[in-house]
Structures are given as C-alpha cells and as structure tokens.
Design a protein with these regions (language model features):
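Alpha/beta-hydrolase superfamily serine-hydrolase fold, recognizing
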Residues: 1-184
Length: 184
C-alpha cells in the first residue's frame, strides 16, 4: 500500500519539478519587489507564516492557496508563481506555510491553517476563495468542517476548491508514512 501512495515514483523526471517551481517562484517574487509581503507570521514557529501579494488598488477579494507535499515537504516559497494569474485578475493572494510531519501531526497542521486563514481574513476585505493542492486540498476541505473557522470568516468564503486532495485518510494509517502523519 505504501508504494501506491508514492506519487513521485510514477512520474518521469519527478525530481526535476521542485527546483523549477522554486526558481520560477523566486523570479516572480523578485519581479514584484516590495509589493510582496514575505514571511508574515501567524503563529509561533518559523514555518507558521504566509506570503501576501496585495493589489495596488482595491482587490476583488483574496485567493488563499495552501501547498501540498504530503504534509511532509514544501512551503509557500515553491508556489509563489501561482499568484500571477489571480493578481492579473484583480485578486490579492496569500500563501501560508505550516509545520510539517513528523514534527507535528496532521491534526495540528489543520489547526495551523485555520489560524492562518483567520489572520489573512483579518487583514483583507471582501470574498475569500480558498484552494489547495494534494495535502493542501485536504486542508482547505477541512476548513468547511463545523467549528473550524469563526462565522465571520466562513461567511466570506466564496469558493473552496480542493485540487486533487487526499480525501480519505484511513488507508494512510496502514502505510509507512503514518509514522510521520500520526493518524490513529
């Protein structure tokens, strides 16, 4: 079962993608200069921070993208380039990072994302569109669970779009990765 969840093993040249994402994102951030607010803290650890890409004028709303990486890898720096399209269409963009497994479990990461969303919502106005990929897709879907977010934030959620999320975590309990995930 562990081999079935090893995504990278089934993608030709998988190891080439992350350096490309990092380089493209770095160039994007550098091109924005002072417009990008990098490393805005929302919690006590260094990874509990987000990058915020505001609009020069009033934004149509805020797009929040939560990265994937099996809750064990990557951070906001790898995905900055994804903000380009939303910015071009008049949306501010925020991209949080979170502590990774095995230092913390998935339940803790879920709470961290809820805190990040509350912090971002507190500094923005208008609708919020929430999206994430893979593990990030799981995390954004969890934000719709009762009690995860205050009503004032929930009322602003216009769209929640999990992209290729890990939706059923039970099979992960029987993988080698669960030593990191701490699912019971």
């Amino acid at each position: 079962l562990s081999a079935a969840y090893a995504n990278g093993a089934y993608i030709d040249g998988a190891a080439l993608y992350p350096p490309r994402w990092d380089a493209t994102s770095k160039a994007f951030r550098e091109a924005l200069g002072d417009q990008a607010e990098q490393g805005v803290s929302y919690g006590p650890s260094p990874r509990q921070a987000y990058d915020f890409f505001p609009m020069d004028q009033t934004a149509k709303g805020t797009l929040i993208f939560v990265h994937g990486g099996y809750w064990r890898m990557f951070d906001r720096d790898s995905w900055s380039f994804l903000a380009k399209g939303a910015l071009a269409r008049g949306w501010a963009v925020a991209m949080p990072s979170y502590d990774l497994c095995p230092q913390v479990g998935i339940a803790t990461i879920t709470q961290q994302i809820a805190r990040a969303l509350q912090d971002i919502a507190g500094r923005t106005e208008g609708p919020i569109s929430l999206t994430g990929h893979s593990a990030g897709g799981h995390l954004v879907a969890r934000m719709l669970a009762p009690g995860m977010l205050p009503a004032a934030v929930m009322d602003r959620l216009q769209h929640v779009v999990p992209i290729s999320p890990l939706s059923d975590l039970e099979p992960l309990c029987w993988t080698d990765m669960n030593d990191d995930f701490q699912l019971d």
